[in-house]
Amino acid sequence: MESVIFSINGEIIQVNKEIITASPYNFFKRIQDHHLKDEAIILNGINYHAFESLLDYMRWKKINITINNVEMILVAAIIIDVPPVVDLCVKTMIHNINSTNCIRMFNFSKRYGIKKLYNASMSEIINNITAVTSDPEFGKLSKDELTTILSHEDVNVNHEDVTAMILLKWIHKNPNDVDIINILHPKFITNTMRNAISLLGLTISKSTKPVTRNGIKHNIVVIKNSDYISTITHYSPRTEYWTIVGNTDRQFYNANVLHNCLYIIGGMINNRHVYSVSRVDLETKKWKTVTNMSSLKSEVSTCVNNGKLYVIGGLEFSISTGVAEYLKHGTSKWIRLPNLITPRYSGASVFVNDDIYVMGGVYTTYEKYVVLNDVECFTKNRWIKKSPMPRHHSIVYAVEYDGDIYVITGITHETRNYLYKYIVKEDKWIELYMYFNHVGKMFVCSCGDYILIIADAKYEYYPKSNTWNLFDMSTRNIEYYDMFTKDETPKCNVTHKSLPSFLSNCEKQFLQ
C-alpha cells in the first residue's frame, strides 16, 4: 500500500495515499504527486498530535476537540486548510471564553486572522474590562487596542474614575504612551482623581470628542406622578433599558440618588405631613425605611455630597423651617447643621467645592408669605449671606457646572422662566438667554459638556457657547432625578505621600 510521508519536528507520519487523493482540501490536492518521491514532506508550525487528529477527521469525520488541545488543532487546521475543523475549533474557543483567558484568545485571533474569535474575545474584554486588568497580558495590549476597547459605547465602566484607574494601570507597564490619558473626559472625573493624576505628572487635555462610554453617562430615575400612586422607573444609557423600580404614594416630597439608591424624603401621604425617609435600591429594587428626620415636613431641598444626603428647609405644616441636617448613607443617625439664616421651602441647594449654596424659595409664617431672592452659603460650619439673585423666585432649579452655579427658575408668580449664572469666585450674578417658557416642574443636571433640562421637552444648554439644543419628548407629569454611580472614589486630600495608598485603595475598589 503506497504511503505519503510527512515529517513534523523530526517525527515521521506515513499516510495512506488513498486518504490523500480522496481529500477535498486544497493542501492535500497540491501534494498528491509527492507520493512518487522518496523524500518526506516537511510540515512546519504544526503539532504532531494535532496533525494526527486532522487525519482522523479525514478518515472518520470525527475529531476530539477539548479546551486543552483546541489551539494546536486550530493552528493545524488553518495551515492545512480544513474549514470544518476550523469552524469546530472556533466554536469551542468562543464557548469557553471568560475574563481570565479573553486577552489570550484576543491575541490568538489577531495572530491567525480569525474574525469570529476576535469579535467574541473583544466583546468579553469590553464586558469584563475591570477584571481583565488583573491578567498579566493586559499590559501588553497596544495603545490603539486599549483606546478602541475603552472608546466602545458598551465598555463596562460606570464612572470615569474607573476608566482612569484602568489607564493608570496600563501606563505603569507602558510609560512611553502616557498620552493615552487624553481619552478621559475631565468633566466626569472627580476632583480627587484629577489631583492624583496631576501628582503623577500626567496632564489631561480638555476633551473635544463626544462621550462614547455610555456607562459614565448619567442614568436617569423617572417618577411619573399621579393623584395617588407614582411609578418609579430607571433608565440606563449603557443597556438602553427602562426598568420599573417601584411605586410611592407620597406627594410634595423631594428625592435624590446616592450610592445607587433613590431616597424619597418627607412630603405628604393622604394629606398628612410625614417625616419618614424611604430608600429603594435601584439594582435589587428592595425598599427600606430609614431613620426619620427631625420633624414633619414637605417641599424640602436636597443635595448629596461625599456619601451624605443633605435635607435643607421645608414646610412644617404652614410654616417654613430653617432646619438643615444630613444622613450618611448606610447609617441611622441624622446630624444637625446650624439652621438657615432665613427659613424657606421650595428653594434649591447645590454643592460647590464642598460648600452648600441655598437660594430662592418661600419664607412663610401664619402671617407672612415672602418669595425670596436671597442666597446663603454653608462654609466652615456656618451660614453666610451671598449676593442675592436678580429677582425673587419661589421655584428654583440649580446645578453646579465648571465651578459655578447655573439657576433656572420656575413659573408661579413670575411671568416667565429665567436663566442665571452665579460666578462663585466673584460672588456675582449674571442673566443669560433663556430659550423657552414652561409652567410646571423641571429637571436640571450637569451632563459633561452641557446642562440637561427636561420640561415640556428635552433641552441641552451648552454654557461655554451659550447655545441650546431642543429634542421633542413627552414629559407630562414626570419628574427626573439624576443617578450617580455607587463606585464613588474615596474622598481625601491626596498628597505625594498618600498617593500610593490612595491608588492602591482605588485599585481594590474598582478593579478587583
From Swiss-Prot:
> Where are this protein's Kelch repeats?
216-261, 262-307, 309-354, 356-403, 405-449, 452-498
Which Gene3D superfamilies does this chain map to? 1.25.40.420, Kelch-type beta propeller, Potassium Channel Kv1.1, Chain A
- Taxonomy, superkingdom: Viruses
Which cysteines does the record link by disulfide bonds?
none
Domain BTB: where?
2-67
Q: Which SUPFAM superfamilies match?
A: Kelch motif, POZ domain
Q: Which residues form the BACK domain?
A: 102-176
Sorted alphabetically, which keywords does the UniProt record give? Kelch repeat, Repeat
Which family is annotated?
Belongs to the poxviruses Kelch family.
Name the chain's protein.
Kelch repeat protein C2
